[in-house]
Amino acid sequence: MSWLRSSPLRQSLTRTTSSGNGIRPIDAATDCDPRACYDSFCKHWQQAYDIIQHSSAPAPTHDDVLGVVSHLDYMVTLLLVELHNCNKISLADSNAPPTAPCLEYLLSENLLDKLYEWAATTGRYANAVRLEQLKLYELLVSHSRHQLLCHEPFLRPLLKILASSQGEIFPPDLEKRLVILLNQLCVVLMQNVHLLDLFFFSAQTQVQEQIQNGNVPPPKSGTTTNFIIFSLLIPYVHREGSIGHQARDALLLCMALSQKNSNIGTYIAQYSSICPLLVTGLGGLYSRLPNSIEINSIDWHRITPDDVTEIPELNLFMNALEFCNAVVQVAHEMIKQQLLDFMYQGFIVPVLGPAILQTNIDSQISAMSYLDLILRSITEPGLLRAFVKFLLDTEKFDGERILDALVERLNSPDGNLCMVTMALFDTLLGLHCEDLMLELMLKYMLPGKHVPISHRHKINKIDPYLNSTEFFLELTPDVMKRARDLARPKSVNEHQQESALPNELSLPSLPSPVMSKTIGANWNYYGLHTGDSLYANLQAYLFEAHWRIAQCQRDCLKWANSYRYQKWPRQGQPQNRLHNHALELAKQFFIEFGGEGIGGLGGGAAIASEAGEKQLDSLQSIGESSGYESFKWRPADEDVSASSGNGTGSVVVGDHPGHDVTISESDVDGHNISSSLSNSSGRRESWRISHNTRNELLLTDLDFSEDLFAQGTVSLGPFLNAIWGKLQTFTSNSLYVNLHLTGLITRLAWYPLPLIHSLLLRSDIVITSDTPSFHQVLRILKQQIDAELPVTEDSLEIIDVARSSLIDREFRLVNARKGNENSPLHQQQSLQHPHHLQPLPAPQQTGAGAQQRSAYATLSAATPVQATPFSAYDPFKRSNNSRRSISKSITSMFSRKSTLPAPAIAPTPASSGLSQIYAFFTGAASTIMGNNNQQSSNQTHLNSSSSSAVTTCETSLSTQPHATGPGSAQLRTTSSTISTSSGTTAGSGGGGGSGSNSSFSIGGSTQTLSAHSNNTTNSSSTLHGGLDGIGPPTGSFNSEPVSLDSVGSSMGIIANTSGTERSRDLALCAVLLDEWLKELAAIAQEQSIVLVTDQWL
């Protein structure tokens, strides 16, 4: 078929498609004589028809086929000119239909039918002639839209060529033209639904006629009905490239047509194989995904959209998943239900289930990352409902629930697995699904045993929320309060007031704010010096909390149950005996524990009972101080409005007629709660709504004898226990684990449920459980940070660097060119542009006792070091290596060489310029210089002059990428001496990690240097870094490029020399805890507003 490449029709169509929109570029000013065009059209057809009649013998020759194709090319050109003129005429005068003599001749003489019959006899040239026919139909359909479909001389040969294409295997170019034509036909049918029956016919009528007249084979599906366009598109649903995209778009149009025509929906659901094909293809594409992910970034926790785009296997899988999501969204109800059933039984359970339950950690990380990506990608409630059922199913995996397995992985010692798990739970909590929240938290909290009896009446109160705001702000570590005071400008009166304070109340003696480096030029606090950062901006936290809480409240209002502290009578047991028993227990409680509410048991303790089914709890007469309320669900089959003295508003559980019935199942057993599972057929609910209705409750949660003696053993459930366990190790976790941990708890605090608030936001409510409460853990963290990080100048310097690094991290995240620089594409760009190198993680330490690397062991080679927070307007920012710092010049001016043994100095070296001058006069500087002059002569990179012998790290030290090979310097700071020695470290060249069939690389990977632990006794910190080959060698270090975050960070060099590694980690924890407490305070304040509004409504 090489001869066809030079045919006139191919060349003309090539020019047509090259114009951009697939239409031949015809000059609007062209004036053609309609009569001349018609005569030329008739002449070309007569010549082509003569060739057809002449070549009808055994088979046409090469010249015969070429001649017919040439004449067809001229005929198509004349038709396009005529249609173009007709469109201009129709715009000018839309009342009178324009005449099209060429098109009328084409239809009246049955030219297309004769052409099809001749093409069937072309033998080996059949595909070439079919290709030209498809191009002809494509051009006519695109220009005439639905007008030609109404004419039988055009429709009959079109149906014949489509029917003959079923079950055939065509070359790629012919497949492309076929899919394009089918796509155009779907667009036309979507706009003209009344023409749909032309392509949807039964085998007894139109198909049989076509078979008899046109020798067309019957459809291979063997069905009595056939939607021929849909049948031809099915084989291309999983095809790659533009063919697959166009086929899926056309199939979606057919699915949308099924909503308008029930016959189409019935045919697709009952007679086509689209649903099994979609599910099996999705499972096959999932099996091609890498079984393990090679992680090259220390903070990687989920797959980004860039990763999906740049990994071919993942891109194909996500295309198929998004197509299934779209089908469920637009298809007929029968198709939707069938696809959901196939998805659950054929993909979610047999494919995702075993993948998630694997025992290998790498496989678990990859499977959970894929699940997280799936949950973040799908939007259709039906699919989300299926995944919720999958997480809670207890029958498919030998009694083990997927949700329980995920909760156990929160306690994993592997940092990557822990972060991926927390990211997955962040996605799950963001679904605002009632069943998930019930299984994770609410079913353990509903009995109310985690709250003492005397505190249960406080749960629905609103006033204490404001006290909780002050409580969170008071938990700020002392060093952060001092740093905040130094950053805030003080008036003369404030200085006088401070000087008037007693000595025992004054803070430790520190330099004035003017002399301290810890004052950030852009550090914002309550709107002061805001700059561009949102750190310490309480207004930003309030706005975020308001928006998040409002969004969560809108979703929770659709739940089937209101999880509030309510009163409700016991059912099925004698009321008098229950009331008497409760009153006796109440009297014993107040007598034994000296409660203040005993006075309420006098005249006001009469038991009130009402006739009818709706009775109020008799314990209501005890009063608010008794605390004998219990957590109750209101029945879903009736509307109940109950009011009490503790501020509980009325709750009405009504129907949700606009939502689907949920298919998830979750039982609430144990904890003295019995619930009956029932599916209400008369109510259609959202996927977020649980179908559990609590109409029959045992009042055993009022068994105060159990409460009084067993409150200390109440469990909050494995999920909260795992979260609290991680929070207790806050100061030893990595920065990124803490970021995910605080984000997860913050998302829980967004829920407008007083039950959850009693754990997180209410500091006035005592929690009695088998683990320390949330507020107790926060107090312990504050005490630990205050004890290990006292308010000293060195601590404030480290705090300043930690704060600067987090602000710089924020700016880099905001200003990143792409949504996430964790992608493999960013790897390649980083390799191509070394001046944008990002810090990377060093090889992980082996052994059971290996500890996580400190985030302060990193330094960005792209950004100069700053002691103050990053600012584009910082006038003291210097990135030029030729400029030397003032502190270095002063130090070299007063320096003197000494070879005497150095006396012992403080464990933490002075870091500021003025402190170095002071250290010089006290002998510390000479000690450092003396140790430096004892180095060997081959360490030329460290000693170039007498002034460069000072190796104390200064705040103005600059960092640059490596320029002279693997040379490095190791600085060991011990408790008695500071010695500097040069050496070489085994630096491993970076790479993106080669992908394979079982793994692929995610995260920036450009350069890695080995990080070795310091084995020297009494060692407090170790720094590995390559010397800067440009500029003065003194004080120019590159620290170990361990990744601080996915987009890089600028950590001050002072963080590697001032204080121990533990103090630097504590500084990061202090800054993060300070910001998190502000966020929790903002959430508590906004939740009080939400509750007040809810009561008034």
UniProtKB/Swiss-Prot annotation:
Pfam families: DUF5917, KELAA, RAI16-like
Xref: InterPro entries: FHIP, FHIP_C, FHIP_KELAA_motif
Biased segments, Gly residues type: 986-995
Sites of Phosphoserine modification: 491, 823
Highest rank taxon of the organism: Eukaryota
Biased composition (Low complexity): 641-654, 824-852, 932-948, 973-985, 996-1006, 1013-1022
Record's signal peptide: none
Keyword terms, alphabetized: Phosphoprotein
Skewed-composition ranges (Polar residues): 1-21, 949-962
Region (Disordered): 1-25, 639-684, 820-856, 932-1042
PANTHER family noted in UniProt: FHIP FAMILY PROTEIN CG3558, RAI16 PROTEIN-RELATED
Family assignment from sequence similarity: Belongs to the FHIP family.
Protein name: FHIP family protein GK23746
Organism (species): Drosophila willistoni (Fruit fly)
